[in-house]
Amino acid sequence: MAAELLFNCEVCVQVRSQACEERRLNVRVNVELLSISNPVHKKDLAVRLTDDADPFFLYNLVISEEDFQSLKSQQGLLVDFSAFPQKFIDLLQQCIQEQNKDIPRFLLQLVYSGSVLDHTPVSLNVVETNPFKHLTHLSLKFLPGNDAEIKKFLARCLKCLKEDKMTLEDKLRKTEEDFTRQLSYTQQSLSEKSRELDKLKNEWTSYTAALTSKHTQELTAEKERALQAQTQYQQQHEQQKKELESLHQRSIQQLQNRLSELEVINKDLTERRYKGDSTVRELKAKLSGVEDECQRAKQEVVSLRRENTTLDAECHEKEKFINQLQTRVAVLEQEIKDKDQLVIRTKEVLDATQEQKVILEENTEKKQSHIEKLETTIKSLSAELLKANEIIKKLQEDLKTLMSKLKLKNTVTIQQEKLLAEKEERLQKEQRELQETGQSLRMKEQEVCKLQEQLETTIQKLEESKQLLKTNENVITWLNKQLNEVQMLKRMETPSSMHGGIRTALSPHGMLERPSFPSSGISHTISPFYAFQKFAEPAHNKNPSPHCPVPKIQFNSQVSKIDQHSDVQVVTAATGHPANKENGDNLGLESKYFKKKEDSIPLRGLSQNTLNSENLKPYLPKVQPSLPAAVTTTSAYFPG
């Protein structure tokens, strides 16, 4: 005989009886299909009603094909025996779906014909409710289980409980082994990560201290240089103004003297009148040229002032950039502190899990001892039950012969029933305790899963912090490189091709003087422009050590023709870098930091057309082939 389980679930049932009021009861409905092959192949439908809280609640129903035909004719069913089990299960599922509602559409009713204690047949009705009428779709009669069936049912329940207990013990052992391995591995990884964090902290503190000291020194040096350059520019502008005014006054006096001489000559010599007028016109043209030169000199003063303002703005931008870097360093220190706190929290959580593990082990030992005691009690109960069965058989045999001793035997049976009831209560308590231990084990498994997730998150955060530290180190190295490039300015080379009365010399602060013209009284200087830009280092400059770079400046001067405008440009080459930094990589920064500024104004020289060529001839140098100038590039701040 083979049994196929079709349905096994708890259903809320409405219990009706004549002796007591209506009440609701959770009943487990078990539907099985029994196939019998000896001597004829048959299929029977077995339905069993049980209560998990009451082990003596047992009602059975076995429907064969012949019984179903009579049931079909009595209740007017339209389904064959092969489709009846599925339809019955569908009705039960509809009852389960509707049982939590206030007014369910489908109900299961368990109706007792007599009292509950009489062990009379019970009818199970599937009822559909509507506002007009209650319709019974199906009504099945169940027989109460006898002592043998109840004993079989109890033995089956005990067997299932033992199997569940064995599986739970195996799971406990496996989980304990897994947890011990995982805890040992996590402890090792945590110790390694804590060591790495300590090393990183020490390196970071030393590195930040060195950086702050370097940056402060460099800032003070740059500020002093900017102030010195500003004072020098102001002094030079004042000197140029005074010289131009004196030259203008001298030229005016000379012209007035010549005019007076020409008037005397006109009075004396009327024949040379036209020549005097021509000389007067020439002198007027010279006056206009001198005035144009004065206006151009004023324009140069205005352009120099603008350049001073641009340099001040660049200094302010660099100070802002340094402040931003200091704020970034503070943010990174705060992130490191937060990660330290996270590590401390994870350590606390691990300690708590270890304590919980110890408590769980103690509880499991207690439960195992308690289960062993329960097994001994169950064995004693089974032995007592066997003895009780033997006594009952003997009493049944003696009933036929000894009617006079019925009262005494009845008292003995009552006492035995009391003992059985007490034993059954103990069994129920033990079943409840087993359920509670299973629930506690599930809770502990969930807690362990949560702890594993927390450990994984902490490991991910540690990896992210390492990546952040690497990016910060790259940013700091780039900043050091930029600040070193700003510090290193190259010296200016004096041109060797100048001749005669033209003076070309560097002032103590890097100023280049223009040639002075004593006949006209004009003498002014050229102010250099420092461009902070990287160039490729020549091969012969790679020998100095990277720790002590020597600044070098390239200057290319050319003397143009007298009738053309001359532009003076000073180009500064980049300082020598260490061998490993010649390529000038950007270290992950954006390209906006390397863009050129195109709003600067170049320095233009005074026009030489306005000067008298006859006065300048003895002071002009002979054009010589100049030395090959170094390769110059346009400045990022002063192009063109």
UniProtKB/Swiss-Prot annotation:
Domain PISA: 40-92
Role, per record: Central scaffolding component of the centrioles ensuring their 9-fold symmetry. Required for centrosome biogenesis and duplication: required both for mother-centriole-dependent centriole duplication and deuterosome-dependent centriole amplification in multiciliated cells.
Subunit architecture: Nine homodimers form a cartwheel structure with an internal diameter of 23 nM and radial spokes connecting to the microtubule triplets.
Species this protein is from: Gallus gallus (Chicken)
Coiled-coil residue windows: 154-475
Name of protein: Spindle assembly abnormal protein 6 homolog
Keywords: Cell cycle, Coiled coil, Cytoplasm, Cytoskeleton
Localization of this protein: Cytoplasm, Cytoskeleton, Microtubule organizing center, Centrosome
Primary location class: cytoplasm
Domain statement: The 35 nM long coiled-coil domain mediates homodimerization while the globular N-terminus links the dimers at an angle of 40 degrees to form the inner ring.
GO biological process, one term: spermatogenesis
A cellular-component GO term for this protein: cytoplasm
